[in-house]
Amino acid sequence: NYGSLGAQNAKKINLLDKSSLFEELKLNKNLKTCFLVFQPTTNSNFDVVKNMKIIEKFLFNNNFEQLLVSHVNSDPGSKEFISYLKDGGNNIKFEILSSLGIQKYLSMAKHVDLVIGNASSFIFELPLKNIKSILITDRQKGREITDHVFRSKITLKDLQNTYDNLKITTNKTGYPYNKNNTD
């Protein structure tokens, strides 16, 4: 099954410039920024606190100063995720962004230094805008991915190796979901 209505809509979206976007959202555009797009995985034994501590340590080790988090769905684990962000011993400034809409979401992903998470947009929409991302967890397992998507386990070593590969990769590849019923 190929095709994605979201991807088809994303093709037509004009991205906002970084200054306007960050100013509108009252964010500091000069900080090294990671955009975390994470949805809890249903039917999974995902330890939110353990894995977020690893991600936070990875970001700290790579001098990220700001973590922007897209609002999560209501699947099991989302309350723990939000609680960790609000109550955890964060070594990094974070902001939860809600209701971005597709234009701001794609613009944010384009203008930050790193996009990491497990959302289906990593498979469909982000590659259309030539946005590279680190895909964590098995939430998108079985879906065809492009060279824009870098799979990683949530360990310091694997995240670092994946990030290093992402930074040096410049190739643009074909888009697997641009077949059959799509443009």
What would you call each of these model-derived segments?
Residues 1-183:
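Nucleotide-activated sugar donor-binding and catalytic core shared by glycosyltransferases
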